[in-house]
Amino acid sequence: MKELKPFTVQITIPKDRIVDLLCGALEGGSNYWAHFQCSVDDFYDIDDPTWRLSVDDVDGGDTFTLKREDLAKGLQILSEIVPHHYSNFIKEDDDAETADCFLQCCVFEDVVYS
């Protein structure tokens, strides 16, 4: 039997849904492993070209800087390595755990903490 090749589909995600995930992570979902600073006054103004989110990994001691494109990359990684969280996000049934996994995918390209 021939191996079936998967399809790749591109979808457009509204900015407010990405901001929802970011909010869930920053306001509770990821506070157990990270501290945050932002380059602009509004943490959620991801359209500002100077927007940068500094993420301090309190366990690992490293600091990471995220840009808008890292959010898109993180969402793609979320869909690949924790598809049930991605599915919850798409169905608008996401929670703080989904938001935390999203942020970890943005920062580490993996889910390191659980």
Question: Could you tell me what each predicted segment is?
Answer:
Residues 6, 31, 35, 42-43, ...:
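Intrinsic disorder/low-structure terminal segments
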Residues 24-32, 46, 77-85, 105, ...:
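Surface-exposed polar/charged interaction patches
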Residues 1-57:
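Long, contiguous N-terminal structural blocks used for assembly/anchoring
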Residues 57-85:
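Acidic, low-complexity, intrinsically disordered interaction modules
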